[in-house]
Amino acid sequence: MTKSELIERIVTQQGLLSSKDVELAIKTMLEQMAQALATGERIEIRGFGSFSLHYRAPRVGRNPKTGQSVSLDGKFVPHFKPGKELRDRVNDD
């Protein structure tokens, strides 16, 4: 599902909200989440999951075109850990 598909689903389910209002709310929420992660904060949405940063250590990678070894710097990457309710819902038979 893309962001625009999510907006359309919410607009369809919630008849009182305009497409512009839903789009603004989602863009604002995602921007706030990105800013929080950029400053090292952890985001927890109970019942859904948590977002945090994991450190990826420096390593040697390969250029897929040439096969040449390339040194990759260490960096932080966003990580999502699903909550129990989300895991149960996804795995519900």
From Swiss-Prot:
Residues 59-93 are annotated as: Disordered. InterPro entries: Hist_DNA-bd, Histone-like_DNA-bd_CS, IHF-like_DNA-bd_dom_sf, IHF_beta. Transmembrane segments: none annotated. One of its GO terms (cellular component) is cytosol. The keyword Transcription applies. GO terms for molecular function: DNA binding; structural constituent of chromatin. GO terms for biological process: DNA recombination; regulation of DNA-templated transcription; regulation of translation. It holds the Pfam family Bac_DNA_binding. Gene3D superfamilies: IHF-like DNA-binding proteins (4.10.520.10). Keywords: DNA recombination, DNA-binding, Transcription, Transcription regulation, Translation regulation. SUPFAM superfamilies: IHF-like DNA-binding proteins. Residues 82-93 have a biased composition (Basic and acidic residues). Heterodimer of an alpha and a beta chain. Belongs to the bacterial histone-like protein family. NCBIfam families: hip, PRK00199.1. This protein is one of the two subunits of integration host factor, a specific DNA-binding protein that functions in genetic recombination as well as in transcriptional and translational control. This is Integration host factor subunit beta.
